[in-house]
Amino acid sequence: MRLEITVFPKSGRFEVVSKEGRVKVFLKSAPENNKANIELIKEMKKLLKADVRIVSGLTSKRKVLEIQMSKEELERLLSIDL
């Protein structure tokens, strides 16, 4: 499953929210030396208990993640509608 997200680094917390059909991910880390991307992958893997990788947007706030699970399972785990 591919998931389009917008990340907000240096937010002081890790949180995934869905608002107006968009998924937003708030990160503690700064977007320096790949720290925000590393936190994103680590925390999403821990939350979803699935393989997660960034397929697009390594240097952008807008990213596409590839997650090894069904859309329904992803919606249930994140409590969002896609």
Located regions from the model:
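Beta-rich strand-turn-strand
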Residues: 46-50
